[in-house]
């Protein structure tokens, strides 16, 4: 019994350690359904704010500002293929800094087939130098343990190598945040592959939170 208690305590401690630093994600539409984030989340909880196709970027700014005012750490998405040009990106980053003190963003390609403007991928966003201009020195980039329907495995590997090189060269603290994953072996095998290929960026695993079967099925199709 004593041994079992020790093992159970160790397991609980491991779970608690693994759960530290977690974040959640919210859409502007989802945020509108929440009266006060401070009533359901601990202070300084990291909340990623999505930038979905067809969404007004200023809607993301508004949610980011609200989260900041309610005591959260807001991390807005930057969807490369949904941005018009560097001027729009510059203005958006300026708004995030001025309205919510943002010092971290999550950069993704974005779920559209045809870019609306000058950017096609997240690396192009990084290469503008605008993050550094606005004092944003920490950023997440997408990880794809299950691959991507939009990008070949070779292109994904090349992009990850470029992001590792960028982080070393520019001093920006990049990390990988993966797509939603349901099977641990897939994630673990992917991590071994990218590490063997030279990845040194920290990895945050995306998992779905409590949801209905219908919602989980929709996540699985993303």
Question: Language-model segments: what does each one mean?
Answer:
Residues 115-222:
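Catalytic alpha/beta core domains of metabolic enzymes, predominantly
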Residues 2-158, 165:
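Active-site beta->alpha loop and helix N-cap motifs at the rims of alpha/beta catalytic domains
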